[in-house]
Amino acid sequence: AAASEKGYDAMHGYDYVQLVSKFTMGGVFYHQACDNYLDEKMNADNKPNDKPYKDGAYYTGKEHSWDEAFGYWGAAAHGATLSPKQNYDITKKKNMRDADANGDGVVNLKSEMNYAHAYYAAGFDKGGNTDYYNTITKAFIDGRQIITDAKGEKLSDAQRRGVKRHARTICSNWEKVIAEAVFKYAGSVYSNIEAVKATMGGNLWQVSGSTAKAEHEAALRKYAKYWGELAGFSLSLHTSGVNLGEIGVKMDRLVGMGPVMPDGTQVNGMSNGAYTVASGKSMDGFAVHMLKLQNLMVEEFGVEARNNDKISGISNLAEVLGSGNSAEND
């Protein structure tokens, strides 16, 4: 990545900026919240509620742990009072009026801005088919209320069960938000395969002429961007502490270790610090992988927003998904 040109490796189709940033959201935020603060730190013998988090702290161990997880979620403190479009536009800096909850004329980036997966949730919710943002944020608020109501005493078994129930709501919906992103970017990769092919004419991957070459390189750049986002989000699904088993294996094989390039190559591993590549791959076959991936997100994760849907309009979907020329990557 360090040797690439501004984070872009044109030979292998890697956009490291997108790949690393999207995976970091999952590998840090989602992982820390769902495999740490909302998991073992909610156990009776971990970060007790009848003791300060640390010497001099005015909050308990449980309060700190729950609040830390909420911070990783990334929602504005007043986000639950806004519509999905308002929350989405706040992050896009298109609606600073609604971001300024206390009306002091400035936006507090700590409490009045949406970040990370909360932003993506709002983006999916504004389509009207889901309510991820409010479901997760309300579960955070309700779980925190249980901890607050304990008034610095140990949580009872019933209180702890309630807290863990809200934690499950948070993490199951958070997983679906990430799965929605996988669905979305699988659709983007699918579309950009067609865009790349459209710049190749009858010369396969050999593009001549300055204008044609520029168009081809621009299409490849966007293709790499979307694959990087897809790979980052799909890898994130592995980080909650829940073993995805065969579903995860299938997802990883469909995404691949890199996108299939116009010359039929695709990264398939590393040796002595350098990428190894397979040859003879098909971009058309990889496009079918993206359809299979969208179908997997529907069947196994129950995504409902389905932004950038490429499978609903295919009348012979079962036939396409069973295509023999799109065998999954080994």
Which residue ranges define each predicted feature?
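Mature extracytoplasmic or organellar-lumen-exposed domains after removal of signal/transit peptides
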Residues: A1-D330
